[in-house]
Amino acid sequence: MESRLLDILVCPLCKGRLEFLRAQDELVCHADRLAFPVRDGIPVMLESAARPLDAPADTAHAS
């Protein structure tokens, strides 16, 4: 994920900073405790696509 993109992306709920977790391919909002998936290099910034941070990463984002 490009660092320029990370500089402008914010959490769609609280408008807070996001952290990119490369190993999980997720953008994490620590304030809302949500992880947004990155699919094929494209962040999916929908609340409905996010998983709670307390949910296991391997079962998240199943559609």
Curated annotation (Swiss-Prot):
The domain of life for this entry's organism is Bacteria
List, alphabetically, the Pfam families matched: Trm112p
This protein's GO cellular component annotations are:
cytosol
Write down the SUPFAM superfamilies for this protein, in alphabetical order: Trm112p-like
InterPro entries with a match to the protein in the record: Trm112-like (IPR005651)
Describe the family membership recorded for this protein in Swiss-Prot or TrEMBL. Belongs to the UPF0434 family.
HAMAP family with a match to the protein in the record: UPF0434
Question: Mind telling me which PANTHER family this protein's record contains?
Answer: PROTEIN PREY, MITOCHONDRIAL (PTHR33505:SF4), ZGC:162634 (PTHR33505)
> In its UniProt entry, what is this protein called?
UPF0434 protein BAV2101
